[in-house]
């Protein structure tokens, strides 16, 4: 049996009794035209090791393999799907490996040891999508050449937002300090089974050249959590907590970064937050010298 001879996904769900679990944030994308579009966003995968989180019954899984990925590692917590995924593995000629476990705990680099670039493609579970993105952005060095990720539309907007946008915040600053990010596809709720209450969207992230990547993600997280946690306050007030953790004052950080203490976080560009993170790190390290 080949991939195009596999039974329709609805039949697979029925025969294996694979109803979606709300506790896992599961919403299945069954439209094979849409899954093919998503898989193609990864580009040529003929020499790549792909990874997918939360494959479920295997809609996107089939598309990734059909688009020619050299191999695919699927990380799935829900053991109910293992039988359906094994059928896909057989149909793909043994190119699929399934790792049962929590994707937040999995060390992908220990599992993806073969040749070729690594690429991430996932319809991310709604309840852990942001955490997984931060995990992958924190990796040093970034081990993947591209990530094609589906989020709730609200989260996708936050990843690609620009200064002044309503959605601009911590996620945009951290993502765009490490990658180029753009919104590639909008997916209506009706495309899923069961349909979620919100729309979804696919974001494509390409790591910036090594020299342009901001490395100190921990400092950037501290600064952005503080600044956007009180986004209606001026930076002088919103940065007070983070500054105290670094053993300095908000005014000192802002002066070092060349920023106006009366501004709010929403108008500060990516470079400005990186300057604040550098100033915070310098103060933090000096206090422990």
Swiss-Prot record:
Kindly report the protein's main subcellular placement as a broad class. Answer: cytoplasm
Q: Name one GO cellular component term.
A: cytosol
Per the record, what are the reactions this protein catalyses? adenosine(1518)/adenosine(1519) in 16S rRNA + 4 S-adenosyl-L-methionine = N(6)-dimethyladenosine(1518)/N(6)-dimethyladenosine(1519) in 16S rRNA + 4 S-adenosyl-L-homocysteine + 4 H(+)
Q: Which Pfam families match?
A: RrnaAD
Which compartments does it reside in? Cytoplasm
Q: Which domain of life is it from?
A: Bacteria
Q: Which InterPro entries did the record assign?
A: KsgA/Erm (IPR001737), rRNA_Ade_diMease-like_C (IPR023165), rRNA_Ade_Mease_Trfase_CS (IPR020596), rRNA_Ade_methylase_Trfase_N (IPR020598), rRNA_adenine_dimethylase (IPR011530), SAM-dependent_MTases_sf (IPR029063)
Task: Give me the residues that bind S-adenosyl-L-methionine, please.
Answer: 27, 29, 54, 76, 102, 123
Query: Which Enzyme Commission number(s) are listed?
Result: 2.1.1.182
Which UniProt keywords are listed?
Cytoplasm, Methyltransferase, RNA-binding, rRNA processing, S-adenosyl-L-methionine, Transferase
> What GO MF annotations does this protein's record show?
16S rRNA (adenine(1518)-N(6)/adenine(1519)-N(6))-dimethyltransferase activity; RNA binding
Q: What class of enzyme is it?
A: transferase
Q: What does this protein do?
A: Specifically dimethylates two adjacent adenosines (A1518 and A1519) in the loop of a conserved hairpin near the 3'-end of 16S rRNA in the 30S particle. May play a critical role in biogenesis of 30S subunits.
Family, according to the entry, reads as follows: Belongs to the class I-like SAM-binding methyltransferase superfamily. rRNA adenine N(6)-methyltransferase family. RsmA subfamily.
Question: By its UniProt entry, which PANTHER family does this protein fall under?
Answer: DIMETHYLADENOSINE TRANSFERASE, DIMETHYLADENOSINE TRANSFERASE-RELATED
For this entry, the protein name equals Ribosomal RNA small subunit methyltransferase A
Report the source organism: Maricaulis maris (strain MCS10)
Give the organism's phylogenetic lineage.
Bacteria, Pseudomonadati, Pseudomonadota, Alphaproteobacteria, Maricaulales
Q: Which gene encodes it?
A: rsmA
């Amino acid at each position: 049996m080949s991939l195009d001879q596999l039974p329709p996904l609805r039949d697979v769900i029925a025969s294996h009794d694979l109803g979606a679990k709300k506790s896992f944030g599961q919403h299945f994308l069954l439209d094979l035209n849409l899954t093919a579009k998503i898989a193609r966003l990864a580009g040529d995968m003929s020499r790549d090791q792909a990874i997918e989180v939360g494959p479920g019954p295997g809609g996107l899984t089939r598309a990734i393999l059909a688009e020619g990925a050299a191999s695919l590692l699927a990380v799935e917590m829900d053991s109910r799907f293992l039988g359906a995924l094994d059928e896909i593995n057989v149909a793909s000629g043994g190119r699929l490996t399934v790792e049962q476990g929590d994707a937040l705990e999995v060390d992908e680099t220990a599992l993806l040891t073969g040749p070729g670039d690594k690429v991430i493609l996932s319809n991310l579970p709604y309840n852990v999508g942001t955490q997984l993105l931060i995990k992958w952005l924190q990796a040093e060095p970034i081990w993947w050449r591209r990530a094609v990720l589906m989020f709730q539309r609200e989260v996708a907007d936050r990843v690609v937002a620009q200064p002044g946008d309503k959605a601009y915040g911590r996620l945009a600053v951290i993502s765009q300090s490490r990658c180029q990010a753009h919104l590639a596809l909008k997916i209506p709720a009706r495309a899923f089974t069961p349909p979620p209450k919100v729309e979804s969207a696919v974001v494509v992230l390409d790591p910036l050249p090594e020299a342009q990547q901001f490395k100190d993600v921990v400092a950037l997280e501290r600064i952005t959590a503080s600044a956007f946690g009180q986004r209606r306050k001026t930076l002088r007030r919103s940065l007070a907590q983070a500054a105290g953790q670094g053993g300095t004052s908000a005014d000192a950080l802002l002066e070092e970064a060349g920023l106006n203490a009366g501004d709010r976080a929403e108008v500060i560009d990516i470079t400005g937050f990186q300057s604040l993170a550098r100033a915070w790190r310098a103060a933090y390290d000096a206090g422990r010298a």
